[in-house]
Amino acid sequence: MSSSSSDENETTIHRTGSNTGGSGIYSQPRAGSSKRTSNVRHDVSDVDDEEEHYARFREDTAIEVDDAITVLLSSLHFEHKRDIVPTDEDDNKLRELHEKIFALITSESDVNRKRRLKKALPASNCVREQVYYLRRKPSTPPASYYHRLNAALHTIVKESFGEEYRKVATVLGLVEALAEVLILEVHTFGINETNPGEHRNIRKLIANALTNLTYGQIHSKRRLCSYDGFIRCVVRIVIESPNITQVYAGLIRNLSWNADSGMSEALQPTVHALSIAAVHAHTHRFDVTATLSALWNLAGHSVENKRTICDTPNCLKVLASLLSPDARFTSLVDSATGILKYVSQYLANTSTHLELRSLLITRMLTLLKSASFTCVTNTLGAIANLIVKDPHMQQMIRQDMAAVQQLNVLRNSNRDDIRTAVKSVLNTLNQPCSHRYGDMSHSVGGGATGMQMLSEPQLQMQTSHHAYHGTASPRLLSLRATRASPGKYIQPQAQQQLIQTPQVDQRSSSLPRHFAVQRNGFVMAQSYNQQMDQHQQQQMIYQLQQQQQIMFQTEDQAQMEHHQQIMYLQQQQQQFHQIQQQQQMQKAQEADPVPPTDDDLDIPTSTVMGTRSNSERSLGSMNPGSVMTNWNSSLDTAANSSRALSPVSYNDIPASPTMCAQVFNLPKSTESEHHQLTSQQQNTTHYSSGSANTMTRSDGATTVPMDNIITPTYAILNPILVHEQTPNGTVPRKTSEELDSPDDVLPGPSLEEEEGDYAIIGGAAQKTDDELLTRSIQSEMPTSSSTPKMKVSPRLNGFFSPTQKTTSSPAWSHPDTSPIPKSSSHRTQPNRRQDASDADRLLMESIMSEMPKSRIISPRLAGTQQYLEPEPERRSHSKNEEADRRDAFTASHEPSDHNGIDVARGSDWSPQQQLHRMESLESQASSEDSFGLTAEEPNSSTSGAAANTMRFDDEIDASLPMDCVDDDDYDYTYDHFEDYEDEEDPDATQFDDGVDAQLTIDCSMISSGSGSSQRNETTTTSRDSKALATSTPKGSASSLPGVRQATRVSTNGKSRLPVPKTNGSLVDKNPKPIIASRRPRLPPKPTLLKDKHYPEEDSIENQTRDDTIYVNAPVVEAEQERIYMNALKQQKNIEQSPSIGNGSPIAKSAIVTPYNYQKPPFTGRNNGEMSNEKSVTPNPKQMLVTIV
């Protein structure tokens, strides 16, 4: 073998026999030596000349060495002599060439460079020798071939990671030698070699060596791409040898990076091979990474490469499947998204691969939160290209709330490339539709098949010189109406083969559907409403027939379309009537008779208009109904989208809005129709984020569903009574003048619009509405868990309410405590006056509920009228205050109270007792505090029944003024009093912190606690007598008829008052009984008594046995005299009459010091009987207190 000699001594260049005294072997000079090898000896004087000569030689040879080596290697002509079998002479010439290269290297002046050249020369020489060997095409290579070539390739790969080595290897022609070895290796042994392991290893090492040698070396890349047969060999290896595809894909990746036009053209055949390799190796993550990286670079070279990637079977599907937000596959996803960024540019301008676009968009939206900036940038670029001309993809992104939110987040990114890409996507999503009428037919797959079916007038509509397309502005389309109408020319391909007749024209992208005027050679369709009567349907059919005669040329086509439309309308009408009849039958069997409505209630009150509680759906709800839910609008808003009034062109803008409003008188739905539609389609309208399932109906048969169009719809608001009803119960229709108004297209929720926008209360619907309103009012009022929501005062009976008969049980004793009176179940004919009063009372309830700290009118009982005091917002009371109320309640319950109640319940009164009772009531009615109310006196049985039905909790509601506390709330049963008999607190005061600051406690008729028979005869509860409730604590003697309420006077007392200090001397004279638990007592806030004399009080002075206490108030002379006279008379009566029953002690008076007491305006007394009381003069800082 010719290469054996060079293998034995690679450093040997030639032999010389002329030298004497030598071995004849020329050794290389020592590295770094500046002397030439010569037998001539120089003198010392010649040293300077030699150094100068060497300097000139170094400058000359610095440039000549690389060029000389290149010229020597170019003489080999590997590409041209590839098929020529070398001879021995050729082997000798190659050996001489290597010696000349070595001689040139030794002449290199740069020591480091010379060293690197000498290091790379042996491996390059070995590769060239193997080229000569492979030219001979040996059938079976010797063992030395594999070992020598494998060792040389390992050395090259190891050293090729250094940049300087790559430079000298390029000078020594190592790139061309490796390319020629690869070509000859594949050509000689083939892909399916006999010894695949060895040859695959050699080819793998060649690919790795070339990948490293071409890194950053543009000259090496150009030479390798232009090398004859190399790219074809690489393509063959990639396709036929998948085991080493990865390394050759890496080689192509390096060659395709920053490639010029010549390199791109040379690498174009590798695109198809790499696409196939990616499809086959997509399950192997490491194998497909380099392949996708090469395709990423190649996809940006030319449109042809993009088309090749898209046309490769399953290539786009593989790319879509590889899109994953998993961080482990970041490098893989970066390459996949990079390919899609370039490929999407090709897809944006073509109509191919439409079925994969939605999949690609969906998968790429999940990558917006990726941690890789490269992945995010590539994804945004691909999305921007895919949606720029496809409104379907734009709508899909708009409906993805998470994707839209992430896009808005990426707008604030710190990277310019990401912000630029996001800006492109958002601009496309936010701009209106820029496509024209016929563009959608191509983008959805119509193609040439749809265009071939167009007639001459139809083709005119598609051309750009048409008036509509020449002047129409995309700004006329709203932002929401992103999906244009597909038009009548788009049909499924199977349907086009069966039915060759064109369909009825549908609506366009700009005009409302009811606009049926011919414009520029085409006619717009009208909206279809299933509730049209027969006359309107015939009229619509006639208009359709006229349109068909204009649009279609032949009479047969028009008749066929006319027949189809009539069949469709008749079928819809029959279905509608059948469902209506079934619903009416069910309504007649199950529904109760609806009471007739009152004419006075036809006008909605401000309360109803403000709350809108009469409908389950509100105009402001997020689920605003649709045409299918009986909203009586003049337009089919679910099908119109929001482009209701857009003109065809600027020239066709109508002079008046009424020219675009050809609508019909739509019949209003009856109650049965409403029940039928609402029961079946209560929840059929979706939100705007999803597709509405209300089907679009046009005058013609719609071949393409329109349910993805997001259109504004409105909810129904009591559709049974939307419009004003006539006395006979029918719903009048609007006139044509009213419907011609453009404001009727989309009625808004204005309070000043016609009454048809709001519901009317009447009949059974009113009761439901009242209950809803009541619950809404009560829910807004602050409540307490321990107290009832409202306390009712019986003295308000009859105020602002109609006169009714007294019933034994409350009309609103339902657990819900609804203040609205409920109609009796046995009443069949409702009273119109009562309904009217109920409406007024409902209005008053609503008004008063919004007024804080004011009396609320509420129908408490059926025959009376009372006030409701709203529970003020307050902080919780302390334990001492709650204890005060319990003690006050305990102190007032005596056995005499039980006996009095039992007498009032179980036995009839004597005439004397009744007369005594009536006089007491008259005196109360005549007083100013009682409002002059007159209530009918019920019998004892009625009072007992009412007493048994009233039951409330035991604790008092301290948040309410005591004069509004109804005694019906308290339980006076015998069992209740037994719980407190042992806890009686004689020291209990009548004061409570819960009393309103503007109320005065008038306790002139407080019981002394004795069980006398006189008390049993004259005492009864305010529940039995309908007497006024007083401002005394719960459980006290407030049930006595003689208790009066003082007039309210404004005061500035806001803070809690301390416990009044008593006179010690008087306390010693009148010791109080000691009880187990003694608590501090708090006085009420200071108030003023009204300066007015009550002449009626003289008539009841002899009927009472209680002492009057006036607290914290200056009194006039007449009032003070009356107080002392009453005290003396009562003291005299007590001394004359013996104690009855259990012998209660005689009440005595004591003087205690009040907190804010003022000096009385008088100084003396007129009654001579008060001489024994002279020693007790009124002290300005004292008050009169009766000790029981």
Curated annotation (Swiss-Prot):
It comes from the Eukaryota. The keyword DNA repair does not apply. Changing residue 338 to E: In bp298; at the L4 larval stage, seam cells divide asymmetrically as opposed to symmetrically leading to an increased number of seam cells at the young adult stage. InterPro entries: Apc_fam, ARM-like, ARM-type_fold. ARM repeats lie at residues 314-358. Residues 604-624, 677-701, 778-788, 800-811, 909-929, 937-946, 1014-1039, 1164-1180 have a biased composition (Polar residues). Residues 1-486 are annotated as: Required for interaction with bar-1 and hmp-2. Keywords: Cell cycle, Cell division, Cell junction, Cytoplasm, Developmental protein, Nucleus, Protein transport, Transport, Wnt signaling pathway. GO terms for cellular component: adherens junction; beta-catenin destruction complex; catenin complex; cell cortex; cytoplasm; nucleus. One of its GO terms (biological process) is negative regulation of cell division. Gene3D superfamilies: Leucine-rich Repeat Variant. Interacts (via N-terminus) with bar-1 and hmp-2; the interaction with hmp-2 is relatively weak. Interacts (via C-terminus) with pry-1 (via N-terminus). Probably associates with bar-1, gsk-3, pry-1 in a complex. This is Adenomatous polyposis coli protein-related protein 1. It comes from Caenorhabditis elegans.
